[in-house]
């Protein structure tokens, strides 16, 4: 006799199904907070499994990386092609406190910059900020026609490209090595690109000069005090806003 399972005997009642449990019933929502250097602090919400036994929800949240458009963070659509990466470093209550983790361009913006009849110049610099963050900055630039030029093409010579790249490296090193990571994130969108464009005008005129990518290579030992200061926990909450205050001279009372 064959030994096996008798399918006829093991059948249960028809029509009964196992009750499906909602997976979101075991999860909690946390708010993602951007540093106070940005105009908009509330990035969005993230979900995580509730703390059960030795599995802590805070440990699951720490280290998460969120990609946000700079246009949403600064309320300015001119920065819509820049993507900012934010990393969760600390969880306080239902708030995830983040720090800058990198910057990148959208692929459609990069593709729109590359055109015919011009030279593409790229440079990358690894630099250490004053607060011991090791970052690598990638710069991109394109040649443009001179005001009196008749020729259609704007190809730069190899010697000119080398001279422009040298200037790009010098400016990026000077601007990045003398500032903190927070100050660097403010300079990256426009300031460094304009400085490069101005400095290389005598070699060959450039256009569309950008820091297209910022990569975080190494960070210092975690300091909760520095993170709280970055989020304005120990100071006023007007960081990230435009400074539009009038200067008023203090009048000292006579003693």
From Swiss-Prot:
SMART domains: Ribosomal_S3Ae (SM01397). The modification N-acetylalanine is found at residue 2. Its main location: cytoplasm. It is found in: Cytoplasm. Residues 1-22 are annotated as: Disordered. The gene is RPS1. GO terms for biological process: translation. InterPro entries: Ribosomal_eS1, Ribosomal_eS1_CS, Ribosomal_eS1_euk. The lineage of its organism: Eukaryota, Fungi, Dikarya, Ascomycota, Pezizomycotina. Pfam families: Ribosomal_S3Ae. Keywords: Acetylation, Cytoplasm, Ribonucleoprotein, Ribosomal protein. Component of the small ribosomal subunit. Mature ribosomes consist of a small (40S) and a large (60S) subunit. The 40S subunit contains about 33 different proteins and 1 molecule of RNA (18S). The 60S subunit contains about 49 different proteins and 3 molecules of RNA (25S, 5.8S and 5S). This is Small ribosomal subunit protein eS1.
């Amino acid at each position: 006799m064959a030994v096996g399972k008798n399918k006829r005997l093991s059948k249960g009642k028809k029509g009964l199904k196992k009750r499906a449990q909602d997976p979101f019933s075991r999860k909690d929502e946390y708010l993602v907070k951007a540093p106070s250097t940005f105009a908009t602090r509330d990035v969005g919400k993230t979900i995580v499994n509730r703390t059960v036994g030795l599995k802590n929800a805070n440990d699951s949240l720490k280290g998460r990386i969120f990609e946000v458009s700079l246009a949403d963070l600064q309320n300015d659509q001119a920065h819509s092609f820049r993507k900012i990466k934010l990393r969760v470093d600390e969880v306080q209550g239902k708030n995830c406190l983040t720090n800058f983790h990198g910057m990148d361009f959208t692929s459609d913006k990069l593709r729109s910059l590359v055109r015919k009849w011009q030279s593409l110049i790229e440079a990358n610099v690894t630099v250490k900020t004053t607060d011991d963050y090791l970052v690598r900055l990638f710069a991109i630039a394109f040649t443009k026609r001179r005001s009196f030029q008749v020729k259609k093409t704007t190809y730069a010579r190899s010697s000119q490209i080398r001279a422009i790249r040298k200037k790009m490296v010098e400016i990026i090193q000077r601007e990045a090595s003398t500032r903190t990571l927070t100050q660097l994130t403010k300079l990256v969108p426009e300031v460094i690109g304009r400085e490069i464009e101005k400095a290389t005008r005598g070699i060959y005129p450039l256009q569309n000069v950008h820091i297209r990518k910022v990569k975080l290579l190494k960070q210092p030992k975690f300091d909760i005090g520095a993170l709280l200061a970055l989020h304005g926990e120990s100071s006023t909450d007007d960081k990230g806003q435009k400074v539009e205050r009038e200067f008023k001279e203090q009048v000292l009372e006579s003693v």
